[in-house]
Amino acid sequence: MAVQQKIRIKLKSYDHSLVDKWALKIIDVVKQTDAIIFGPIPLPTKTHVYTVNRSPHVDKKSREQFAFSSHKRLIEIINPTARTIDMLMKLELPSGVDVEIKS
């Protein structure tokens, strides 16, 4: 039984539509190379809440909260070819999307 190679691509962004759009573009590129693909798998959204004082030095009771949601998608590619990797390397992702690739 041969060992299957796989690549995991994790996309992160504060904008969910940007993550979904680029996940679909990556899937379209990989489908052209006849590799098996799973995804995009939505991972849990993390919300980061930051609390700051409204006043510079007094009124501790007066605060303001800011929240940022971090959206993630996971794409798995099974048995990638050299052509698959070349096409993935040629993709130019926008600055708002963070990409993490593991093999």
From Swiss-Prot:
Single GO molecular function: structural constituent of ribosome
Chain's gene name: rpsJ
Family per similarity comment: Belongs to the universal ribosomal protein uS10 family.
A GO CC term assigned to this protein in UniProt: ribosome
Key words, A-Z: Ribonucleoprotein, Ribosomal protein
Source domain of life: Bacteria
An individual GO BP term: translation
Signal peptide (from-to): none
Organism per entry: Chlorobaculum parvum (strain DSM 263 / NCIMB 8327)
Keyword ATP-binding: no
Known role: Involved in the binding of tRNA to the ribosomes.
Assembly, per entry: Part of the 30S ribosomal subunit.
Keyword Glycosyltransferase: no
Protein name: Small ribosomal subunit protein uS10
